[in-house]
Swiss-Prot record:
Homotetramer, a dimer of dimers. One homotetramer interacts with 1 SecA dimer. GO terms for biological process: protein folding; protein tetramerization; protein transport. This is Protein-export protein SecB. One of its GO terms (molecular function) is unfolded protein binding. Its main location: cytoplasm. One of its GO terms (cellular component) is cytoplasm. One of the proteins required for the normal export of preproteins out of the cell cytoplasm. It is a molecular chaperone that binds to a subset of precursor proteins, maintaining them in a translocation-competent state. It also specifically binds to its receptor SecA. It holds the Pfam family SecB. It is found in: Cytoplasm. The keyword Protein transport applies. Keywords: Chaperone, Cytoplasm, Protein transport, Translocation, Transport.
Length: 154
């Protein structure tokens, strides 16, 4: 009979907390913007940051900045920093990097998207539904860029 792996060798992942770290909404050209025909140009910038809070405990912050222009004028600017505290223990380095750089942001994104949508509606603009983001693909692109930079420096 095969022995089970020791309990302390098992990987552990858990969500400890999801929280709103920072939020900003600006509509610099209101109320004039409400009188114009609505043909928005939406720009989304996103970034993630991670830091270790303790052994196996990490804070991940997903920052989304949405800038919407209408007829070349800024209709609104919305920035949300959605944070999470996660336990990620007993993972190899590559797996931990993927967890912190892609898996955790995937968990945080729906919360940030909902906050942005709510702020936009409260600003009395048409609802903004952000498309899903493929954080796995973004993380893979990041790894490829890091590898190319390493080759260029060598």
């Amino acid at each position: 009979m095969a022995e089970a792996a020791p309990q302390d060798a098992q990987q552990n992942f858990a969500i400890q907390r999801i929280f709103l770290k920072d939020v900003s909404f600006e509509a610099p050209n209101s109320p004039v913007m409400f009188q114009k025909e609505w043909n928005p140009d939406v720009k989304l910038d996103l970034d993630t940051q991670s830091r270790e809070l303790g052994e196996g405990v990490y804070e991940i912050v997903l920052r989304l900045t949405v800038t919407v222009k209408n007829e070349e004028e800024t209709a609104f600017l919305c920035e949300v920093q959605q944070g999470g505290i996660f336990t990620a223990e007993k993972m190899e380095a590559g797996q931990l990097a993927h967890c912190l750089g892609a898996f955790c942001p995937n968990i945080l994104f729906p919360y940030a998207r909902e906050t942005i949508s709510s702020l936009v509606v409260k600003g009395t603009f048409p609802q903004l539904n952000l498309a899903p983001v493929n954080f796995d693909a973004l993380f893979m692109n990041y790894l490829q860029q890091q590898a190319q930079q390493g080759e260029a420096e060598a």
